[in-house]
Swiss-Prot record:
The active site is at Y100 (for dna cleavage activity). A motif (RCR-2) lies at residues 60-65. ATP binds at G228, P229, T230, R231, T232, G233, K234, S235. It comes from Maize streak virus genotype C (isolate Set) (MSV). Keywords: ATP-binding, Covalent protein-DNA linkage, DNA replication, DNA-binding, Endonuclease, Helicase, Host nucleus, Hydrolase, Metal-binding, Multifunctional enzyme, Nuclease, Nucleotide-binding, Nucleotidyltransferase, Repressor, Transferase. Divalent metal cations, possibly Mg(2+) or Mn(2+). This is Replication-associated protein. Homooligomer. Rep binds to repeated DNA motifs (iterons). Forms the O-complex, which is a Rep-DNA complex involved in the initiation of RCR. Part of the C- and V-complexes which are RepA-Rep-DNA complexes involved in the c-sense and v-sense transcription. Its EC number is 2.7.7.-, 3.1.21.-. SUPFAM superfamilies: Origin of replication-binding domain, RBD-like, P-loop containing nucleoside triphosphate hydrolases. It comes from the Viruses.
Amino acid sequence: MTSSSSNRPFSHRSPNTFLTYPQCPEQPEIISQRIWDLCSHWTPLYIICAREAHRDGNQCLHALIQTEKPVRTTDSRFFDIDGFHPNIQSAISPNKVRDYITKEPLALFERGTFIPRKKSFLGNSSKGNSDKKPSKDEIMRDIISHATSKQEYLSMVQKSLPYDWSTKLQYFEYSANKLFPDIQEEFINPHPTSEPDLLCNESIKDWLQPNIYQADYGTRKRSLYIVGPTRTGKSTWARSLGRHNYWQNNVDWSSYNEDTIYNIVDDIPFKYCPCWKQLVGCQKEFVVNPKYGKKKKVQMKSKPTIILANSDEDWMKEMTPGQLEYFEANCMIYVMQPGEKWYSPPELPPTEEV
């Protein structure tokens, strides 16, 4: 069970949510109604809330809410009520949680019909008194209903369907990622614009506003192509603009992140860049075939790509006339001038007069 007090990124997914509000003076009925309203999106079916007294004289409220669809949130403050922050847990055994709540309540409120945890198929097939062996569909339905995390889901599959787990692990990992998606951590720019003091040409500033800084996915973006010498700071500048996918040497679609603003293709020869038209053209949806992986649909939301190339691997020199026409129509082309840099040179200390 995952507590909201963890320092790790918070994630909660469960149809049975157990909440504890320390030192909360509100009535169980009032708290129950507030929790019921908070969970309205997932269709509440049952709630019980009780006040408990501790030996030190303090009181707390315990609540169990059951919903038709699993409550899903990455906001650790989602269940906060009037400044009172609860401990949030997935009630793996709602029967035991309900027994605990109703043990010695000072006040209690209940609404709806309690749903006991369904008897799990897991491990029952080996018992001699089992009515019949459950089907794989029944086993997977049971696992999906009870799993509360990616790790628990995969562990239950491994225990219940060992052969399928060993031969189809990739598919189970895919479904686990869909059921329990990773939490997007807060983006910390590894290349802030002030370290070093980065700068760019005025014409590129005009490109930045509509294509990077404006989150209008209804209009089709334009990409940016920069060609010039090495060690000029163009990669550092490109990576300073915000959250992005970064590819060097090859385009690895298995690491593609949809929650980005733009893509960067850095020092990859034209002939080794698959789907270059889709990237340059900021196409909204297309299918790619990652190496050693299954085909996947990429939904770009018209995401621009910044292509960085050194002069000796200029993409435009490798293109056919038709390819170059498409490239120029969908991409701003910027050729660096001799001696041009993407950062301000450090100030030299004043020299002492002799």
